[in-house]
UniProtKB/Swiss-Prot annotation:
It comes from Nitrosomonas europaea (strain ATCC 19718 / CIP 103999 / KCTC 2705 / NBRC 14298). Belongs to the IF-1 family. Keywords: Cytoplasm, Initiation factor, Protein biosynthesis, RNA-binding, rRNA-binding. InterPro entries: NA-bd_OB-fold, RNA-binding_domain_S1_IF1, S1_domain, TIF_IF1. One of its GO terms (cellular component) is cytosol. Residues 1-72 form the S1-like domain. Component of the 30S ribosomal translation pre-initiation complex which assembles on the 30S ribosome in the order IF-2 and IF-3, IF-1 and N-formylmethionyl-tRNA(fMet); mRNA recruitment can occur at any time during PIC assembly. This is Translation initiation factor IF-1. It holds the Pfam family eIF-1a. CDD domains: S1_IF1. SMART domains: S1 (SM00316). HAMAP family: IF_1.
Amino acid sequence: MAKEETIQMQGEVIETLPNATFRIKLENGHIVLGHISGKMRMNYIRILPGDKVTVDLTPYDLTRARITFRTK
């Protein structure tokens, strides 16, 4: 089976939660929960509130996201 296409969006980290989870406000105003992708975790990339991030959303659950890129 091929992987489903993901929806990429921009957002801003609002709050840090336990277990490397973050509350993210997307460009369209929705608030989602996001976790760090494996490559970012391996390279010890730190994410702080106020950082702009790129997230991947799956069409199955639009309330959870995977953080794939961080900009300042």
